[in-house]
């Protein structure tokens, strides 16, 4: 199951964000959202 507000696709959870960030900042932001999350 995915966290509230996230979408499931092929056994993974996804959530788009529209904020502009560097790749490093975006990856850090993902990790802050859900443990184990990564930028794709």
Curated annotation (Swiss-Prot):
<comment type="function">
    <text>Platelet antagonist that specifically and reversibly binds to a site on platelet glycoprotein Ibalpha (GP1BA) close to or identical with the site for vWF binding. It inhibits the binding of vWF to platelets and vWF-dependent shear-induced platelet aggregation.</text>
</comment>
<dbReference type="InterPro" id="IPR016187">
    <property type="entry name" value="CTDL_fold"/>
</dbReference>
<dbReference type="GO" id="GO:0090729">
    <property type="term" value="F:toxin activity"/>
</dbReference>
<dbReference type="InterPro" id="IPR016186">
    <property type="entry name" value="C-type_lectin-like/link_sf"/>
</dbReference>
<keyword id="KW-1199">Hemostasis impairing toxin</keyword>
<protein>
    <recommendedName>
        <fullName>Snaclec tokaracetin subunit alpha</fullName>
    </recommendedName>
</protein>
<keyword id="KW-0800">Toxin</keyword>
<feature type="domain" description="C-type lectin">
    <location>
        <begin position="1"/>
        <end position="40"/>
    </location>
</feature>
<comment type="similarity">
    <text>Belongs to the snaclec family.</text>
</comment>
<keyword id="KW-1015">Disulfide bond</keyword>
<keyword id="KW-1201">Platelet aggregation inhibiting toxin</keyword>
<dbReference type="GO" id="GO:0005576">
    <property type="term" value="C:extracellular region"/>
</dbReference>
<comment type="subunit">
    <text>Heterodimer of subunits alpha and beta; disulfide-linked.</text>
</comment>
<feature type="disulfide bond">
    <location>
        <begin position="2"/>
        <end position="13"/>
    </location>
</feature>
<keyword id="KW-0964">Secreted</keyword>
